[in-house]
């Protein structure tokens, strides 16, 4: 057995598998996209079988590209899109319905009904979350309500519920392990983050039988061993974390006050609050950053539904760019005298507004507005939303923000223009790491440290390396004016919802 770690990064639009060597360097990568299903407006689904196929394909591809065999791999780490719900037959392992994705809004009216019953405070106090369709609990309730025979089968213990990690572990271990980790559990709306356990009151409200829920483990733990037939040898699964928590670990944000922001399909900012459960007064989420050796570290999280998705809209919807990397160059050529604002509420607005009914809008267009201005507005919308999140975090964390340094990762951070504009609008330094695969790196560290082949936490944190720091260059008057325009645009969008 070698010091290699296989990290499986199961995302919203594609699955990536990365083999890291003993020096925490990328040795091999596999990636495969899969189909998105939109049965109705606001509904988003995945086929769990297609996800499973991409996991096998990319893992084998990464191992092959690394030039190693399964016997060289010390452990597997799994990180995944959070909140997405899978329900499958315990006997056959077959899903009873497509996975309902975190972006799916079909349970909005049910969430409103629960709010009118005065239950949001109950959920928030126990889970740190808001009553929103984003989270797993109401999605699971929908499946149990709408799939014929599901309630009775679930009550008999015939059905299993899991976030994507749980489903993959079940499949990888041949149905021998029915487990999840604390970070994924904390996103379900039925896990008590104070007691660190499934909550009977919440499962009763949502009519979810406890028997269908997985065992919850630390992020670095024994999650089972893969079936030897899958990769040519049995490999222990020793690390699991939701994608944003894994990125927090990969960015070595281990100290209270450190924060990172990941820019993928959406944008997710996490602020480490240590052992303190900080209750947000600004509609941020209180969540579990990670749990190691039985000790829970908490975080404040701000979730933005549309980040990279805005660039995809430019490419696939407006067709003003041919490829995502073109966006920064196009934005740079925009007319500086035009103040065009895109509020990308394609599926509602996330933190700190949490309005599922808001819809996208563009303000400030003139006859001279063209592709360059649209590109700039799309990229700036991500920066503005990040500013909103960080302002809310500073208020909750009682920080003046002067010492803020934001560590960034995800596909969008490769754009120098976007990162410079982010620093300008935040009025804070933005650090881009050498290794951009921070989500995979974080879960690889969980697995590698558990296996004893990767360094301990303190040494791992010291090894974090910066590629470039972006410092604010925009003058205060310009920044103030742009932020005022953005807030006006958001206000008008919310009023129209």
Swiss-Prot record:
One of its GO terms (biological process) is glycerol metabolic process. The keyword RNA-binding does not apply. Key enzyme in the regulation of glycerol uptake and metabolism. Catalyzes the phosphorylation of glycerol to yield sn-glycerol 3-phosphate. It comes from the Bacteria. NCBIfam families: glycerol_kin (TIGR01311), PRK00047.1 (NF000756). The keyword ATP-binding applies. This is Glycerol kinase. PROSITE patterns: FGGY_KINASES_1, FGGY_KINASES_2. It comes from Sinorhizobium fredii (strain NBRC 101917 / NGR234). One of its GO terms (cellular component) is cytosol. Pfam families: FGGY_C, FGGY_N. It is an enzyme of class 2 (transferase). ADP binds at residues 12, 16, 265, 308, 411.
